[in-house]
């Protein structure tokens, strides 16, 4: 049975960020910054409440009589109680022999084109730990992108405008960045396990390191770009946020309406149609929050029973990073054109170059992960290197086709001029084979 390290990491980030945010908000209050205090508390307490609801919903405590658990969640102590419960189950699992076990069937990764199916016994204790890990993974994603990401953006914006970074603010920004990166990492792992549910997935440590570097560069660059743009064009940033929000929020619903599928009713039996709609809207909001800052790795599909698309779409990945890179470049250009005196001692061209290189570095680590460290890379129809080689061949072929056509066209023009200058009584004529070859080559 695996040690529940992911549960411990989720609880640590939750407690550390909440404590740092409450401490910093008291500092803002003593300094008279009421607006910064209110926003800091909002981005701290809102994800706390959502995390409590998530843990309560995943464990289905609504249908069970557990008043103490409900009270602890109302007091915002639910994650601590769940973590204590997880470690009690973990340390007691080896002492008691379980009379009832369930058997799960998983397929191994193909070796030499063959994939074997293996059976594994899962006891009640291990099943409970799996449920707890799943609940804390989802809670970490919610905390990261509905709380930590806005919190990091806010605190960095305050630091830029005040031209000062205090110890409390730097501590909160560091914890928030770690929380976002960890949430994005959990998104990648959840996406892999959902898409390849029938396989036994084992993620290697180097894969975790590669994902961590990929997400760190991507998220840090995105947050800095948004803060720089907000510091010079406060009104226009609202337009950028609304465009991003409605684009990602409406996209899954537009696909659902175009598919003509019936409204999903099998999310939770205890939920009514209104409750199902609220849950779907919340999932869409979370999906939007993730894509505002980084690639979600999970595509929301409302017409699917699992609500997740299990197909890996390279085209969507390519389009997302191309559009996001262009958007970041445009925002940095606008910041460079309208920057104020607070950036007097900042080398603006160098900063723009560093941010663009940082985003390209994130894309590089992403490609390295999918090429070398993805646990299910053997199931891909084509790898990253093969796709790049195909694109390079097409590009070289197009360049080769354009180069021969230009001089041949000049030779044809010169030969036609010579033919016009030749007297009509002359029997000399150009060979038709030359024109035929040129026309065939250019048409090809």
UniProtKB/Swiss-Prot annotation:
Lipid bilayer topology: Multi-pass membrane protein
Extracellular side: 24-37, 90-140, 193-208, 257-277, 339-349
Sequence ranges on the Cytoplasmic membrane side: 1-2, 59-68, 162-171, 230-235, 299-317, 371-444
Residue positions, PTM Phosphoserine: 115
Residues annotated as transmembrane: 3-23, 38-58, 69-89, 141-161, 172-192, 209-229, 236-256, 278-298, 318-338, 350-370
Compartment(s) of residence: Endoplasmic reticulum membrane
InterPro entries linked to this entry: XK-rel, XK-related_adapter
Keywords, alphabetical: Amino-acid transport, Disulfide bond, Endoplasmic reticulum, Membrane, Phosphoprotein, Transmembrane, Transmembrane helix, Transport
Keyword Lipid biosynthesis: no
Residue ranges of the region described as Disordered: 408-444
GO CC terms, sorted: endoplasmic reticulum membrane; plasma membrane
One term of GO molecular function: protein-macromolecule adaptor activity
Residue ranges with Low complexity bias: 423-432
Lineage: superkingdom: Eukaryota
Biological process terms in GO annotation: amino acid transport
Function: Recruits the lipid transfer protein VPS13A from lipid droplets to the endoplasmic reticulum (ER) membrane.
Subunit structure comment from the entry: Heterodimer with Kell; disulfide-linked. Interacts with VPS13A.
Family: Belongs to the XK family.
Protein name as it appears in the record: Endoplasmic reticulum membrane adapter protein XK
Taxonomic lineage of the native organism: Eukaryota, Metazoa, Chordata, Craniata, Vertebrata
